[in-house]
Amino acid sequence: MKVKDFDFYLPEELIAQHPMEKRDEARLLVLDKETGEIEHKIFKDILDYLTPNDCLVLNNTRVLPARLIGAKEETGGKMEFLLLKRKEKDVWETLVKPGKRAQIGARFIFGNGELKAEVIGMGEEGSRIVKFYYEGIFEEILDQLGQMPLPPYIKEKLDDKEMYQTVYSKEEGSAAAPTAGLHFTEELLKKIKEKGVKLAFLTLHVGLGTFRPVKVEDIQEHVMHSEYYKMDKETAEIINDTKEKGGRVIAVGTTSCRTLETIGDIEGKVREQSGWTDIFIYPGYKYKVVDALITNFHLPQSTLLMLVSALAGRDNIMNAYNVAVEKEYRFFSFGDAMFIK
């Protein structure tokens, strides 16, 4: 299959620039993956589509305020750092701009000097390996000095950092939010549990590779970035129990979906596990664990659009996307949601 098979026209004004004030009042396009039938709802109506046998699988990762603005120690020249991946305790793979000022041995200062950094190596694709120096707790310093690493298509500044976190976020380590989860409120989750639906949590730390364009013409040649995941015993038991009782495993977001499909065996069973995944799901892939998916609307020609096409069929998805554009749904990270059932 070719990348151009996943293209669609998206007017720029449909790219949501800020989150909804009330998370669960975003719009919801419901797509039947077998028939292609479409319904238009509000996100909190998701409750009507869930049954007591179902299990929602949510990614509890938390976004690090991983964008740091600092200065070169010698010259005072302004620098921008974006933390990509923790290599060891105080060593990170980092994108540094401008790169020419970030040679090995270069030192940088942030805030009033409470955080310092040195480039100690070169990483993949122009990234740098950076060691940080500080007193106290790194996460607390980052919380004070760092900004949210919003996707490149969001041009407006975020007033409240928590609006780019899910209400159940817990495990710090992501460079981007698992955005399907942004639509849930504490109250909606409570109602879902009261209905008898099981909630199961796993972790996948979202890397910036999630925004990386597919640069090859033939999608099978694309290589995904690897991302760290973990699933505990309790979550594995809930999912396996759901399968045994004939319930649906509903992934909240493509990150939960990719983690489940990484861990699942050919019988659709999962187990406690952690590791790195570079799974790339595109049409032709047979889902082992995931029965349904709650997700946002994705970029044209993106790997995530290919993932949803593998679940619902390319024609059904491309038709639904064209309808969403026509009906002026909001797209991407802060946009509306889709439930593929």
Swiss-Prot record:
Biological processes per GO annotation: queuosine biosynthetic process; tRNA wobble guanine modification
E.C. designation(s): 2.4.99.17
Gene Ontology annotations for the cellular component aspect, listed alphabetically: cytoplasm
Pathway per the UniProt entry: tRNA modification; tRNA-queuosine biosynthesis
Disulfide partners: none
InterPro entries per the UniProt record, alphabetical: QueA, QueA_dom1, QueA_dom2, QueA_sf
Main location: cytoplasm
UniProt keyword list: Cytoplasm, Queuosine biosynthesis, S-adenosyl-L-methionine, Transferase
UniProt superkingdom: Bacteria
GO molecular function annotations of the record: S-adenosylmethionine:tRNA ribosyltransferase-isomerase activity
Recorded catalytic activity of this chain's protein: 7-aminomethyl-7-carbaguanosine(34) in tRNA + S-adenosyl-L-methionine = epoxyqueuosine(34) in tRNA + adenine + L-methionine + 2 H(+)
Family: Belongs to the QueA family.
Subunit structure: Monomer.
Task of the protein: Transfers and isomerizes the ribose moiety from AdoMet to the 7-aminomethyl group of 7-deazaguanine (preQ1-tRNA) to give epoxyqueuosine (oQ-tRNA).
Protein name per Swiss-Prot or TrEMBL: S-adenosylmethionine:tRNA ribosyltransferase-isomerase
Organism: Clostridium botulinum (strain Loch Maree / Type A3)
